[in-house]
Amino acid sequence: MTQRSKVSIIIPVYGVEKYIERCIRSLFEQTLREIEYIFIDDCTPDKSIEILKSVMEDYPHRKGQVVIHRMEKNSGQAAVRRWGALNATGEYVIHCDSDDWVDTKMYEDMYNRAVEDGADVVVCDYN
């Protein structure tokens, strides 16, 4: 990426082939453009990463914003999230589970609120 991202989204990937497509599409369809997507493969035994790469083909404008990292061994959620946080380049970091999906304006709204309020942390609920 040529400019610093406003938001880095860390998405752990392990055993979610039934859910990950919906998650990816909701992330790639965000109205906020300056996003770094960090998908971390925790040595998933299923086709989750193949699905990710296939869905990426539908969003060529997002390809340069995507990092796919494979852990050396299955390390668990804490280690995966830590790797993501240590390698994120965005002003803000968001953790998104790979079986979740979000509204298309969610991260833009959260980023704008953080900037408006000068907040270090923004939290939200779900509907």
Regions found by a protein language model. Name each.
Residues 1-127:
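Nucleotide-sugar donor-binding/catalytic module of glycosyltransferases
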